[in-house]
UniProtKB/Swiss-Prot annotation:
Residues 1-63 are annotated as: Disordered. A zinc finger (C2H2-type) spans 63-85, 91-113, 119-141, 147-169, 175-197, 203-225, 231-253, 259-281. SUPFAM superfamilies: beta-beta-alpha zinc fingers. It is found in: Nucleus. It comes from Homo sapiens. One of its GO terms (cellular component) is nucleus. The keyword Metal-binding applies. Residues 1-17 have a biased composition (Acidic residues). There is a cross-link at K33 (Glycyl lysine isopeptide (Lys-Gly) (interchain with G-Cter in SUMO2)). This is Zinc finger protein 771. GO terms for molecular function: DNA-binding transcription factor activity, RNA polymerase II-specific; sequence-specific double-stranded DNA binding; zinc ion binding. SMART domains: ZnF_C2H2 (SM00355).
Length: 317
């Protein structure tokens, strides 16, 4: 049927476009803010007029790109690839005017206006506007993680996450904050950071209305209302709402006291106890000079019982 054929052709183009979007680390559906342009492999077999491309050394891929040398089996594939070099965007949206380099990208973009979601997950009935989005979603059900890091072996379900992870090893941080210059390995990390400058808190609690800058902070807060305690102590089974609380509790079993006092050497299990203890030292050591009115500390070895009412400068004058 014509409709089914069109869907199949669109899905084939979707697979081609996915190769462009995913390698870049973001799915932007062919729009202008692409950061890294990768080549796609179209499925059609149409010839296009124009100057014959340079020959390729590979007989199976006789059409080579004169700009980057990549070879293709079909001239039509090369013609589409050439747009990654020329920047040509021949497909325009009649609704908003945005232009795209591939027809499949325009088709997907058009669904942002129509709300159409023709691709349904057979597992959970969730619907998607693009076949590539459905394929990525289905990995949540199957557990498939096809992208493996050659450096550490960690695997990823999405190539965008894989591309961002690689920057941990390479040290690349291409996203710089325009406010403070701090650089990040992923655009999402930059977006979260920028909220520290803008004060934006887009995540609101449905129960009490408290707003948060990070979705993770909202998720933790929600446990106050739900009573959820997902973090369990492996020793005694006690459960906690936050991982930090579990870490503090675990020290009751291990005896670890990671906070030492530089004044007296006493060690503490909790940072709050350590801070309170330090303040006690400060209160004992700060005095107001009766001569000049300045604060001063007791000299080494002195105690409150032997302290004078004057600082060392006034006492010696």
């Amino acid at each position: 049927m014509p409709g089914e054929q069109q869907a199949e052709e669109e899905e084939e183009e979707e697979m081609q476009e996915e190769m462009v979007l995913l390698v870049k680390g973001e799915e932007d559906e062919g729009e202008e803010k692409y950061e890294v342009v990768k080549l796609k492999i179209p499925m059609d077999n149409k010839e296009v007029p124009g100057e014959a491309p340079a020959p390729s050394a590979d007989p199976a891929r006789p059409h080579a790109c004169p700009d980057c040398g990549r070879a293709f089996a079909r001239r039509s594939t090369l013609a589409k690839h050439a747009r990654t070099h020329t920047g040509e965007r021949p497909f325009g949206c009649t609704e908003c005017g945005r232009r795209f380099s591939q027809k499949s990208a325009l088709t997907k973009h058009g669904r942002t206006h129509t709300g159409e979601r023709p691709y349904e997950c057979p597992e959970c009935d969730k619907r998607f506007s693009a076949a590539s989005n459905l394929r990525q979603h289905r990995r949540r059900h199957t557990g498939e993680k096809p992208y493996a890091c050659a450096h550490c072996g960690r695997r990823f379900a999405q190539s965008s996450n894989y591309a961002q992870h690689l920057r941990v090893h390479t040290g690349e941080k291409p996203y710089a904050c325009p406010d403070c210059g701090r650089a990040f390995g992923g655009s999402s990390c930059l977006a979260r950071h920028r909220r520290t400058h803008t004060g934006e808190r887009p995540y609101a609690c449905a129960d009490c209305g408290t707003r948060f800058a990070q979705s993770s902070a909202l998720a933790k807060h929600r446990r106050v209302h739900t009573g959820e305690k997902p973090h369990r102590c492996a020793v005694c089974g006690r459960r906690f709402g936050h991982r930090s609380n579990l870490a503090e509790h675990a020290r009751t079993h291990t005896g670890e006291r990671p906070y030492p006092c530089a004044e007296c050497g006493r060690r503490f299990r909790l940072s709050s106890h350590f801070i309170r203890h330090r303040r006690a030292h400060m209160r004992r050591r700060l005095y107001i000079c009766a001569g000049c009115g300045r604060d001063f500390k007791l000299p080494p070895g002195a105690t409150a019982a032997t302290a004078t009412e004057r600082c060392p400068e006034c006492e010696g004058s």
